[in-house]
Amino acid sequence: MSFLVENQLLALVVIMTVGLLLGRIKIFGFRLGVAAVLFVGLALSTIEPDISVPSLIYVVGLSLFVYTIGLEAGPGFFTSMKTTGLRNNALTLGAIIATTALAWALITVLNIDAASGAGMLTGALTNTPAMAAVVDALPSLIDDTGQLHLIAELPVVAYSLAYPLGVLIVILSIAIFSSVFKVDHNKEAEEAGVAVQELKGRRIRVTVADLPALENIPELLNLHVIVSRVERDGEQFIPLYGEHARIGDVLTVVGADEELNRAEKAIGELIDGDPYSNVELDYRRIFVSNTAVVGTPLSKLQPLFKDMLITRIRRGDTDLVASSDMTLQLGDRVRVVAPAEKLREATQLLGDSYKKLSDFNLLPLAAGLMIGVLVGMVEFPLPGGSSLKLGNAGGPLVVALLLGMINRTGKFVWQIPYGANLALRQLGITLFLAAIGTSAGAGFRSAISDPQSLTIIGFGALLTLFISITVLFVGHKLMKIPFGETAGILAGTQTHPAVLSYVSDASRNELPAMGYTSVYPLAMIAKILAAQTLLFLLI
């Protein structure tokens, strides 16, 4: 393998290619996915320890990965804190703290070295950034450069030993508990109001007096609908801001069937007829590519869309009913209702250009990463003279969460297109895993013949089993969280997309994704801090 030793770029792309290929192979209904890249890197560098990848590669990859996750999760994370987010995150934090305490007890009793013990915890919790944070923290604790080089391999080796069962046990736990609890995923989705429902339009004649302004009906009457058209005295028009319905008006109301039934009871009576038959008004799906309309609530955009109304937003594969507090993102596809001659103006306002979207501005991405790296360098002093910092994982993640929530600063749009986000995220984690895998090959080879390796594997599995049972039992049985959402919380607590993929395939609804996104950011930060704290307590 001398050709891989002599050419680091070739080594990197070979590891990435082989790893991604192996990650697509399904074994017992489960595939490793991008995590296979780590094991390919480990395998090659174990066979030939001189194979290496520049350390900068793993830093860049890690920062890209966590930053893009934070940007996407930011809006939903802070919004969820107003509803179920506090409950879900309390469960996650409690489970992580309890698991870290158990890890400290096991490591102390079994006399496992600190670096390996902290790496075992990160592998059991399947969190690569936390493992990287442990490696980052070692230089501040060890002065001897030669000793540091040897010890820096230990967390990576321990992580790689504990990681495989860290994924497998979580998936098996979810499957077993789902069977034991006799979970009906369809019933859960219906009760939670997240069952996949088609958006429709109905004509409702107003029979209730003193209704709120039409744009306030969803909020004040607690309805997930939007009034897209008003028919009065034989004429149909787009409701202006502040418009009130009159007795006898016919409203075209858009929403899911259940919400439309509730709207009918609150507003008036259903009448026959095609709500879209009027030739004066038309509608069109338009692609959002104009940064000028991104990140601003629809209520503030309304003056730009005179005689036009955005009624639906398709984000990813999900149709959403537009509301006044929603903001547009690059890549959204929106339905606009307007007089036919106004649709061209709507197209110009929203952009409707796939080409423009593909040429997204890299400046906000670079600036956000720069701020994140700087925040990660800030040291927080701890008792005993040591210090704690968020590092190259925590810093970009925290900053990205905030920027994702802010969305834009003046004309500076922090969000990046959905497709670009996913591509950069996949590239980032692949680069990181390839680089970190090759850095531990020599240590992994010696660990194979070391009896302590079995200790790391066994007790790492115990930690994974402990956190799985804690989250699933406490969440579903004691806190009465729907099982699909609880399983998503566990996937988010483990910060592992493969677990989420398994749960989503099994449930076929949005509950797992809701649980996952509500806890993922805080779980990522908590595990980074937990791993570093455990290391400081042990050394």
Swiss-Prot record:
The GO terms this record gives for MF are: monoatomic cation transmembrane transporter activity
Regions that span the bilayer: 4-22, 27-46, 56-78, 90-112, 155-177, 360-382, 422-444, 453-475, 516-538
Keyword field contains Ribosomal protein: no
Identify the domain of life: Bacteria
GO CC annotations on file: plasma membrane
Q: Which SUPFAM superfamilies does this chain map to? A: TrkA C-terminal domain-like
Intracellular or extracellular location(s): Cell membrane
Give the membrane topology: Multi-pass membrane protein
One BP term from GO: potassium ion transport
**Sorted UniProt keywords:** Cell membrane, Membrane, Repeat, Transmembrane, Transmembrane helix, Transport
One Pfam entry name:
TrkA_C
Where are the coiled-coil regions? none
Which residues belong to any copy of the RCK C-terminal domain?
A: 187-269, 271-352
- Stated family: Belongs to the AAE transporter (TC 2.A.81) family.
Q: Which NCBIfam families does the record cross-reference, listed alphabetically?
A: YidE_YbjL_dupl (TIGR01625)
Name this protein carries in UniProt: Uncharacterized transporter Cgl2211/cg2425
Q: What does the record give as the organism's lineage?
A: Bacteria, Bacillati, Actinomycetota, Actinomycetes, Mycobacteriales
